[in-house]
Amino acid sequence: GNGTQQIFYRRDDVQYVSLHGDPARAYPYLSGFADETGAARGAGANSNLPLATGTDDEAYLTLLGVACEAIAAFGPSVVIVSLGVDTFHNDPISDLAVTTDGLRLQGELVAQLALPTVIVQEGGYDVDAIGDNVRAFLLGISVGSDPDRDS
């Protein structure tokens, strides 16, 4: 995440939006603050939405909705999701409270952007739950992109 932000920080042709643990208390500690909005031509194209301790599915989905609105307004031709499932409530490095079902709902919300979507799996350290959590997000993408399909 922080490396991705750095790559695009001065560009206006790529929008970077990130939901992640608050860097005041969570890795990487040095970047990802809400006031980091881009520089030079990229001013305003960078959005960090740090998550408070204990962020649950409802709070996460609310912020993801804000992110999706910003993405839709930007008008991209593709969305790239850096999927970190270290937001999971049992993840050993997490102080968040996202559930497996919440990850499915996140996928559904992202799919509603109705854009070609690339998903890159990044964080996640509860080795017993990573597969279920990634599968849940992908199921959400699948269901969300086909409104006639029932989960």
Whereabouts are the PLM-identified features?
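A general "terminal functional-core" signal
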Residues: 1-151
